[in-house]
Structure formats: C-alpha cells, structure tokens
C-alpha cells in the first residue's frame, strides 16, 4: 500500500513538474516570437512594399498576438500604420516601389482618401506603384487608381457602381413584440430616431443624405478621372451599367485597368520595371515588416497625435460589448488629454476624431477638457470619416479643425430615444404593476409598466432643449460665431466637409499630416516629431483581450461574418447601454 501511494505521489509530482516545464517553454516560445516580431527589419536592395488593401482599416493599428498562430494580419490594419509605412517607403532608397494587392476593402471614403493622398505623394519621389487584384471593391479601386499601372485577373471584377445609402427601419418589427419608442428631439434634420418610429426617410433626412452621397461621389469621380484620364461622364456611365457584371475585357476598353494578367505575370512585369533578371527574387516587405523598419532620426519637439474613435460613452466600463477601441470613453479621454496638457515635452496636440457622436454628457466633459488644453498649447482636430454631433461638440474648442473633403461632420442637435416596453411586458407577457409613491414623479421613467405621461414627456423635452441650447452655445464659442449663425446651420443637419468649410464649421481640408503641420505652425516649431497616443496595449493585455468576447480581433471577425447586419446588430444591442440623451449622428446608414 505504501509503495502504491509513493508511486501515485511520484507520478503526480512528475506530471506537475512536466506541466510547469512545458508552460515555461511555451511562454518562452511566445516571448521569443513576439521579440522576433518586434526586431528591426533589414531592408535589402530592390525591395518592394506590398500593401494589402482588404478587410477593414481602423484609425490605430491594434496588436493581434493571435496572428502568430492564425496567420491573419489583415484585420488589424491601422491607418496610422499604413501612412507611416508609405512615408518610410518613400524615404528609403532601397525600396523601389509599392505593389498594391487589392481586394474586398470595407472602409469609408475619408479614410481611403488619406491613403490615396499618401500614395500620390509617394509617386512624387519618382518611385512606381503597381496595383493588382482579382476583385476590386469600389473603395479599393478608388485607392488603386492612383497607381502607375492597374492590372486585373483575366476573370477579375471591378465593382464600380456609384454610392447608395440605405436605412433600416425597425418600427413594424418591434411592434410585433409590443415595443414602441418614446422620442424627444431638437432639430429638423436630427433623424436618428426615424429608424425606430418611421417606415421611410423623412424629406429632410432624404435631402441631407442625398447631398452627402452626391458630394462624396463627385470627389471620387474627380480623383479617378484625373488619375486614369477618363471623363466623369464616362465614369458615371460605367457605374450605371454596373461594371461588376460586365466582361473583364470591357474594363480594358474603358481604361479602368491597364491590362489583364495572372498574379505571376504581374510579378514578372514588376521585375522588368526594376530591371531584374527573370531568376532574381524580389524582396517583399509587408505592412508588419514596414512597422519594424527604422524611421528617420527623432529630433526636435514632440507633437502628440491622440486617437479618439467610436461611439461616445462616459465610462470605459460602458464599452463592454466588444473592444474599447470602438468607444470614446470621456473619463479616459479627459484624463489622457489632461496628462498631455501637463506634459512639458509635448508642445502641441493633434486630436484625431472618427465618431458619429454618442452620450451628450460625455461630449460636454470632453469639450471642457479640450478647452482647458487649448489654453496651454495648440490643439488641432483632424477629422476622419465622421466627426458629427457629439464628436463635433468635443471638436468645437480646438485651435484649428482639419477635415477630409469626404468627412461627414456637423449634426448639431440632441435627441432622446427610450424603448417603451409596457406593451410587451403587460399585454404580451401578462405582467401587471401596482405602485405606491411619496411624490408625483417618484416612478418616473418605468417604461415597463406604462408609457410616459404628458408631464413626464414635457420634462424630458425641456431637458433635451437645454442640452441643444448648450451645444449650440459651445459651438458658437469655439468657432467664434454668433449663436444665430450657428442655429442656421444646426438643427441636426450633417454636412460634407467641403460644405462645412464654407459655413466655418471646419478651417481646412486635408488629412492627419496637414493637421500636424498646422499644429507645428501654431506652436512655432521648426523641428518636430510625432508620437501616437494612447499607447498601444502590452502584448499580454492584447492577447487576453483578443481571446475575450470584447476583443477587437473578434469584433472584426463578427463584422466580416455579419456583413450588412453588423451595424443594426450593434445598434440594437447597445440601446440598453446608452444614456437617455444623445448627441449622435442623425442616421445609421449603410453606404455602398
């Protein structure tokens, strides 16, 4: 018996030791892979930067430690990483050109315009750009059209079709469950509530949406026309004929592409451009490789570039559905901006905003911190795809506002939308409520028991009215405009940045680089460098987050899986997490 117990204990100790040793070896292997991934990248002569244009592009690249196991790097591309890599490729004499691998790129046009402009600047160095793809989405083609040569697979597709905007309406769907919506708002154009209360677009919403997509399409056609030498009328004709269903040969005749080739043939053509022998290899650098290519000397003063992207909420704990990267949490942002304000090494701040708005209270808090920051050092706002409603609220106090021509901004308005569940709970489910109270409004807002009464709705409307007046006043102060002038361009209306420039909601059309240059000018800096904030999460935090349901990696997987249903899914799922009063973009549309 003693021998049996000894053998069992020895076996258990041995197994325990084995797992410890294997755990240590595994951890060392992971650390080794991460360390090797972060090692400085050597650039060989006759190198080519291979830029993959597929998937989604976020504002900031997020580290995905799972990529070393999954091999999937396309989901974590950051605009900041892409722009930085293009700059490095331009400056490095050993990198001879950029090879664009086009594909199913799902990103809005202001972001694509940033990339396209950077590629156009790259070409000014005398280096070449070649694009190739089996399938070009319209956005991918818009970017790729700046290349010296655009090639396509002999059976490939260019999905050139124009821009359409669709809104989903849930009124009848929710009514089947006995759910209605209590809505109060200020602003004729503040139509975010329509998706819950109407069956189609209002005339005001249709007007502003049509204006937005028409302006964006004009900008796209003008850029492609200039690069490809195709008239705008022809581009519209091609869109009407829906090129995706036309024969590939049609694309060559239409001058949309320069030729039809297979992938290996394009690579041979690139070798000829580089004057390499057929047997010579091309040294290819991916986006991840480029991130580890040494930058130029870091000299001069620091300009901080702070990224704020996603729905506006008050607390990071509110951002529990997916990753915190999809939210602007006011408490964290205010703390970060205060730290930058008090950092004597930071001479100016560029706040990069990409948001359709959100919580009105949170927007007010960030407005205050932006105002305090401006008192100490220049603060320039760079607007991404969206900087509307609550996002414009927080932008208003900036020293200078820069937006891409295709940026959607404005939407100065407030609304509250609250689900009335009383029909579901009492009628459908048969639940009954009774109450006692000390004061008239002690049970205010219990919409599971009953709808708002007239007095309650009037009080909520008064609160929204006060929020709108304050929003309007903040814009007037920040933009140095009379309140009356702000009212004429407010009412919840969204504006394309080209129009926003004319009505003084923005100061300049351009991208992040233009915003940085303006910040340097305002701070009177000759030599400067930029640093990105917030700092990237540690690899351990990133790994744990990637494996959780709140990870950015899984969020992107869900985005690709759900496709067109991702946006309504996230909106409906987040309703119960919202504060009642919102300063949010006036509609949730799917733009294609």
Which functions belong to the PLM regions below?
Residues 2-50, 59, 96, 121-128, ...:
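Flexible, low-complexity junctional segments that flank or bridge functional domains
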Residues 47-167, 296-424:
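Cleft-lining beta-strand/loop regions that shape enzyme active-site pockets
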Residues 132-134, 184, 285, 382, ...:
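Conserved beta-strand termini and adjacent loop/short-helix elements that scaffold enzyme active sites
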Residues 167, 171-270, 379, 422-503, ...:
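Charged, glycine-interspersed solvent-exposed loop segments at helix/strand-loop junctions
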Residues 226-227, 258-302, 415, 472-478, ...:
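C-terminal long alpha-helix characteristic of the crotonase
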Residues 300-303, 307-343, 463, 534-592:
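Intrinsic disorder and flexible/low-complexity segments
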Residues 307-310, 353-355, 383-385, 405-407, ...:
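Active-site proximal loops enriched in glycine and acidic residues that flank catalytic Cys/His/Asp
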Residues 360-365, 499-502, 542-547:
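Short glycine/threonine-rich loop-to-helix capping motif typified by GTGT followed
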């Amino acid at each position: 018996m003693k021998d049996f117990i000894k053998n069992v204990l020895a076996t258990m100790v041995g197994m325990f030791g084995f797992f410890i040793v294997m755990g240590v070896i595994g951890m060392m292997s992971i650390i080794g892979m991460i360390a090797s991934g972060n090692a400085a990248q050597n650039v060989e002569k006759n190198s080519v930067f291979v830029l993959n244009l597929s998937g989604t592009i976020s504002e900031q690249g997020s580290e995905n430690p799972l990529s070393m196991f999954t091999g999937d790097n396309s989901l974590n591309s950051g605009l900041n990483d892409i722009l930085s890599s293009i700059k490095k490729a331009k400056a490095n004499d050993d990198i001879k050109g950029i090879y664009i691998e086009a594909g199913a790129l799902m990103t809005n046009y202001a972001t694509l315009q940033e990339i396209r402009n950077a590629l156009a600047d790259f070409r000014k160095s005398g280096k070449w750009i070649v694009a190739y793809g089996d399938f070009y989405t319209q956005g991918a083609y818009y970017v790729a059209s700046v290349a010296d040569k655009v090639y396509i697979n002999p059976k490939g597709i260019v999905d050139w079709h124009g821009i359409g905007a669709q809104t989903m309406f849930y009124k009848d769907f929710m009514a089947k469950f006995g759910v209605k919506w209590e809505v109060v708002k200020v602003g004729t154009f503040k139509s975010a509530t329509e998706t819950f209360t109407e069956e189609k677009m209002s005339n005001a919403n249709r007007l502003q949406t049509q204006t937005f997509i028409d302006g964006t399409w004009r900008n796209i056609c003008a850029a492609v026309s200039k690069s490809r030498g195709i008239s705008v009328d022809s581009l519209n004709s091609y869109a009407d004929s829906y090129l995706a269903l036309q024969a590939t040969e049609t694309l060559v005749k239409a001058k949309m592409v320069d030729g039809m080739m297979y992938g290996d043939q394009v690579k041979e053509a690139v070798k000829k451009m580089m004057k390499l022998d057929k047997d010579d290899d091309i040294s290819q650098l991916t986006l991840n490789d480029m991130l580890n290519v040494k930058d130029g000397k870091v000299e001069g003063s620091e300009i901080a570039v702070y990224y704020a992207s996603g729905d506006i909420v008050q607390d990071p704990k509110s951002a529990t559905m997916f990753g915190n990267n999809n939210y602007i949490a006011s408490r964290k942002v205010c703390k970060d901006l205060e730290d930058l304000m008090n950092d004597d090494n930071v001479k100016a701040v560029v706040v990069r905003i990409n948001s359709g708005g959100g919580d009105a209270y949170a927007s007010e808090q960030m407005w205050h911190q932006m105002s305090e920051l401006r008192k100490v050092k220049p603060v320039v706002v760079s607007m991404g795809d969206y900087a509307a409603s609550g996002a414009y609220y927080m932008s208003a106090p900036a020293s200078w506002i820069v937006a891409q021509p295709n940026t959607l901004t404005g939407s100065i308005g407030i609304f509250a939308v609250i689900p009335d569940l009383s029909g579901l709970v009492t009628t459908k489910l048969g639940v009954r409520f009774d109450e006692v109270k000390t004061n008239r409004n002690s049970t205010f807002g219990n919409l599971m028991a009953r709808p708002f009464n007239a007095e309650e709705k009037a009080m909520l409307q008064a609160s929204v009215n006060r929020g709108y007046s304050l929003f309007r006043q903040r814009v007037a102060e920040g933009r140095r405009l009379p309140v009356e002038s702000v009212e004429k361009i407010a009412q919840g209306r969204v504006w394309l940045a080209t129009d926003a420039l004319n009505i003084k909601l923005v100061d300049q059309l351009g991208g992040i680089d233009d915003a940085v240059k303006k910040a340097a000018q305002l701070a009177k800096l000759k030599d400067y460098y930029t640093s990105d904030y917030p700092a990237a999460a540690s690899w351990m935090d990133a790994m744990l987050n990637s494996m959780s349901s709140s990870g950015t990696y899984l969020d992107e997987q869900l985005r690709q899986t759900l496709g067109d249903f991702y946006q309504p899914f996230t909106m409906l799922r987040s309703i119960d997490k919202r504060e009642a009063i919102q300063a949010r973009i006036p509609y949730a549309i799917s733009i294609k």
